[in-house]
Regions:
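Conserved active-site motif detector
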Residues: 1-112
């Protein structure tokens, strides 16, 4: 497995991008602080890989910033695990790129 990305050395709060497309706003409205969300990397071979954020149940909510998502996606594809929880959910009058903030944290496979 590749080395842990530097962005995961400590828990990291980051906004989720793309929360206003399709049915994502409805999924966003179901989330609250403390909820666990699912992180899914793009499949291998994608030119600009990223990590997608899904609500419990599987609905897509958005994606990570490319500077975080690209190294994290490669690491996850290679077997790394990362968990995430909702840190903040803003109302519809909050800028879309700041509407959902999650906390990323490395997950030790041996501890699961």
């Amino acid at each position: 497995m590749r080395r842990l990305p530097a962005v995961l050395a400590e828990p990291l709060e980051t906004p989720v991008y793309g929360t206003v497309f399709g049915q994502r706003t409805a999924a966003l409205h179901r989330l609250k602080a403390g909820d666990e969300v699912i992180l899914v990397p793009d499949p291998p071979g994608i030119d600009d890989p990223n990590v997608w954020v899904h609500a419990p149940g599987g609905d897509v909510v958005g994606h990570l910033r490319p500077d975080i998502g690209a190294p994290l996606a490669s690491w996850m594809i290679d077997g790394g695990r990362c968990g995430a929880r909702v840190a903040f959910v803003g109302s519809d009058d909050v800028a879309s790129w700041r509407r959902l903030v999650i906390t990323l944290q490395y997950r030790d496979i041996a501890a699961d």
